[in-house]
């Protein structure tokens, strides 16, 4: 099965849970603007995906350098710099994380960068056990690369920087915990370089995305390529609601689980959420996805613009302390709003936008029919 079809099959399952209001309207309008497809594909690859992975690699490189500097000369200031570099990497990753198709899903690379959710805390226990054991082989990139995905991802590094016992990072030179963290950062740097290089290769994945053909390993025609881009938008929006919000809060503060929020230890939950939205917004705008709409459906684009903007501006105003945010009426009201708007966004992409270009939530993304 082609990588985009694995995404599409997953998309079919996620959008199936959304109330469908637009399926009966799929046939209205002129459908997909075929003439705009080549430019949209080129912009998606050259203006969004490739720069996104290069930015992630650049952030990971700076994070590795910051971790090594902290290990060599520990201080409160250097620890703060490492945490800042971690936050910048969360931001860069979150922006490109939405593109969960292509090289990123090969060789478990996605999980190498972010192992989440860890619902049963198995990954956390593995990280704690590794730090307690302090085996020197786990202080090298090669050693970390041979471990489970839970021990080499951003969540593992977050625990190193902000978990129990992290105060040692600011005082003890070349301590095991720090060197393990530097190895994790180095492994993430190496993984992101592989992905960026594969996207930058002229005869590689970028060619098959920009020029669909029967010989392509990704898309045989424009419809398949547009389906994949629609899949990124819909699946991204659904994932944001399911994994960035409902993982810890579903509308009832009594049953909230703040420590299930991604990056809660480092206070980067909303950094991640906002980055995900910015990633969707960048793909939507820079790839000019609205140009695929028929002329009588341009109001769909205006609605999606409004929803994206509201999500992007609301999230950064919420307390980064998730437990405190859920417990405060004003912040909780904002989270409730994010839940509502993110659901509208997923429906807007799948039903309204997808329907207007001839692909709706009822479209069989699994088989391309």
Language model features by range: what are they?
Residues 24-369:
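Mature extracytoplasmic or organellar-lumen-exposed domains after removal of signal/transit peptides
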């Amino acid at each position: 099965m082609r990588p985009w079809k694995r995404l599409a099959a997953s998309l079919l399952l996620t959008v199936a849970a959304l109330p469908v209001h637009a399926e009966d309207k799929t046939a209205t309008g002129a459908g997909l603007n075929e003439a705009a497809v080549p430019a949209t594909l080129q912009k998606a690859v050259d203006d969004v995906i490739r720069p996104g992975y290069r930015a992630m690699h650049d952030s990971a490189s700076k994070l590795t350098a910051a971790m090594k500097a902290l290990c060599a000369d520990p201080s409160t200031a250097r620890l703060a710099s490492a945490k800042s570099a971690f936050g910048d990497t969360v931001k860069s990753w979150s922006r490109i994380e939405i593109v969960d198709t292509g090289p990123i899903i090969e060789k478990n690379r996605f999980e190498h960068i972010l192992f989440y959710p860890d619902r049963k805390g198995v990954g956390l226990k593995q990280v704690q056990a590794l730090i307690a054991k302090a085996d020197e082989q786990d202080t090298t990139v090669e050693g970390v690369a041979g471990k489970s995905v839970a021990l080499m991802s951003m969540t593992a590094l977050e625990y190193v920087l902000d978990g129990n016992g992290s105060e040692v990072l600011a005082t003890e030179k070349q301590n095991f915990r720090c060197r393990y963290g530097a190895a994790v950062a180095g492994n993430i740097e190496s993984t992101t370089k592989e992905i960026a290089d594969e996207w930058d290769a002229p005869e590689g994945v970028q060619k098959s995305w920009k020029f669909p053909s029967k010989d392509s390993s990704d898309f045989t025609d424009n419809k398949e390529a547009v389906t994949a881009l629609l899949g990124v938008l819909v699946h991204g929006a659904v994932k944001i609601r399911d994994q960035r919000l409902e993982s810890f809060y579903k509308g009832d503060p009594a049953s909230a689980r703040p420590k299930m929020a991604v990056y809660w230890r480092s206070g980067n939950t909303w950094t991640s959420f906002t980055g995900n939205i910015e990633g969707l917004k960048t793909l939507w705008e820079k790839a000019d996805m609205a140009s695929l709409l028929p002329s009588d459906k341009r109001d769909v684009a205006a609605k999606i613009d409004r929803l994206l903007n509201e999500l992007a501006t609301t999230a950064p105003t919420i307390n980064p302390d998730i437990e405190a945010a859920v417990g405060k009426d004003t912040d909780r009201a904002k989270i409730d709003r994010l839940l509502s708007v993110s659901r509208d966004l997923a429906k807007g992409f799948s039903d309204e936008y997808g329907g207007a270009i001839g692909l709706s939530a009822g479209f069989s993304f699994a088989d391309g029919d």
